[in-house]
């Protein structure tokens, strides 16, 4: 065996007809993100320091963790001219791809804004009372973008563009630059997406600066974007002071296949999430045992050609599974129990089966719809709920950068009717001032 070759990777094989299947599936899905106490203590100290000392603390932590020394926070801000230069210097083909992806993401979220209740509304009752809802964008949003090897320009587009479409007045991006090395593609993406300010800071100190504000970096209303364990712990701690998008877990893909798709395609789709990190999860549900064997053979055959094969192998063997189901109906039932981040329905009639899906972050229909298209350029957002949170949460969208205020304008006639109802209920709750506040308006009319 060559030094570059790997032994066959071990993959769980489950069968839904096995009496122990439910327990085996729970074991596959088991993942406790947990909170590392050492990380949490360190993050708490960093956040308190940033809240207390502002810019000075951020500068110190940036020097300590990223090995970037700066005399002031201003020196860590990237100018608009530098962002423009990053875009201009891109290789034409790469720039065209980035701009095409941005255009599609923007078009999708513009449509989402129209269709998802993003406009104010009101109605008037017979007595002249007006009721409604006012929709307003957030004033200022912070976007966290990972730096170093995990720098993803696609994440810039997916986080910044819906904020811009929502009407957010100011978008501030933070991105660490370990050793002072900047990712020009990330900066170019910021320029395309319409980011207003970019600071080369990261970690818990960047989250603290966004959440509390400093003399240089103003406080934001919400922080979105992925990060490492320190960033996740910091976001969890500042929630309430500011809003956050979510605490994301490892990437997930679940493929439901009827056995009609090229097994090499399905194997590579499973790899597409497994290559993210060792804790990523890739699962296949299929009623055809022979087809499952073909996919497994393809996994073994293709693995050696993958640059990130060690990561893929660890992910597939540690958290992956190939599951034989009775039929496609049962596959959909199991998919709803798993509530995956990404769900591919690779079948002859994907729409038929998608009707049975209730819980998934994103649903990819048909054999030509690879999950990777959704990651980069299809248009819908790739920031999706993980760890079964798709049961109760949604992809990042325009709605995450808006808030809603109730509108109530009661007419004189309305005060007579509503006041009596409110007063009666208030007396029942023992709240005299509530009752009298309503009574004054109908007794004096």
From Swiss-Prot:
CDD domains according to UniProt: Histidinol_dh
EC top class named in words: oxidoreductase
Binding site for substrate: 251, 273, 276, 342, 375, 429, 434
Residues that hold Zn(2+) according to the record: 273, 276, 375, 434
Catalytic site: 341-342
Cofactor list: Zn(2+)
Pfam families from the UniProt entry: Histidinol_dh
Pathway(s) this gene product operates in, as recorded in its UniProt entry: Amino-acid biosynthesis; L-histidine biosynthesis; L-histidine from 5-phospho-alpha-D-ribose 1-diphosphate: step 9/9
Keyword NAD: yes
Catalytic activity, reaction form: L-histidinol + 2 NAD(+) + H2O = L-histidine + 2 NADH + 3 H(+)
Binding locations of NAD(+): 144, 205, 228
Stated family: Belongs to the histidinol dehydrogenase family.
PANTHER family xref list: HISTIDINE BIOSYNTHESIS TRIFUNCTIONAL PROTEIN, HISTIDINOL DEHYDROGENASE HDH
Name assigned to this protein: Histidinol dehydrogenase
Organism whose genome encodes this protein: Cupriavidus pinatubonensis (strain JMP 134 / LMG 1197)
Taxonomic placement: Bacteria, Pseudomonadati, Pseudomonadota, Betaproteobacteria, Burkholderiales
């Amino acid at each position: 065996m060559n030094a570059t070759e790997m032994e066959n990777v071990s993959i769980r094989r489950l069968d839904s007809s096995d009496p122990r299947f439910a327990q085996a599936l729970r074991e596959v899905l088991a993942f406790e993100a947990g909170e590392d106490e050492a990380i949490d203590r360190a993050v708490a100290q960093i956040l308190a320091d940033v809240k207390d000392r502002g810019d000075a603390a951020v500068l110190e932590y940036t020097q300590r963790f990223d090995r970037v020394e700066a005399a002031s926070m201003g020196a860590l801000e990237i100018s608009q001219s530098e962002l423009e230069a990053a875009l201009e210097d891109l290789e034409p083909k790469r720039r065209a791809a980035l701009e095409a992806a941005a255009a599609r993401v923007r078009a999708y979220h513009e449509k989402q804004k129209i269709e998802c209740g993003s406009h104010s509304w009101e109605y008037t009752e017979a007595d002249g009372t007006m009721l409604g809802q006012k929709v307003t964008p957030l004033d200022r949003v912070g976007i966290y973008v990972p730096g170093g090897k995990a720098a993803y320009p696609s994440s810039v587009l997916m986080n910044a563009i819906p904020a811009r479409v929502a009407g957010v007045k100011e978008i501030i991006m933070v991105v660490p630059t370990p050793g002072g090395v900047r990712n020009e593609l990330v900066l170019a993406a910021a320029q395309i997406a319409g980011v207003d300010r970019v600071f080369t800071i990261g970690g818990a100190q960047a989250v603290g600066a966004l959440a509390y504000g400093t003399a240089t970096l103003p406080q934001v209303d919400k922080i979105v974007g992925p990060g490492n364990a320190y960033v996740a712990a910091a976001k969890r701690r500042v929630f309430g002071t500011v809003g956050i998008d979510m605490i994301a877990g490892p990437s997930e893909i679940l493929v439901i296949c009827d056995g009609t798709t090229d097994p090499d395609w399905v194997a590579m789709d499973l790899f597409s999430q497994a290559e993210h990190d060792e804790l990523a999860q890739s699962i296949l549900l299929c009623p055809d045992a022979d087809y499952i064997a073909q996919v497994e053979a393809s996994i073994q055959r293709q693995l050696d050609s993958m640059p990130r094969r060690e990561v893929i192998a660890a992910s597939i063997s540690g958290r992956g599974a190939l599951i034989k189901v009775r039929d496609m109906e049962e596959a959909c039932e199991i998919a709803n129990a798993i509530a995956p981040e990404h769900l591919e329905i690779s079948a002859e009639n994907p729409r038929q089966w998608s009707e049975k899906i209730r819980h998934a972050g994103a649903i990819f229909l048909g054999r030509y719809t690879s999950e990777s298209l959704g990651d980069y350029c299809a248009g819908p957002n790739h920031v999706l709920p993980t760890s079964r949170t798709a049961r109760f949460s949604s992809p990042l969208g325009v709605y995450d950068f808006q808030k809603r205020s109730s509108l109530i304008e009661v007419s004189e006639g309305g005060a007579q009717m509503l006041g009596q109802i409110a007063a009666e209920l208030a007396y029942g709750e023992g709240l005299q001032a509530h009752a009298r506040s309503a009574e004054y308006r109908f007794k004096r009319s």
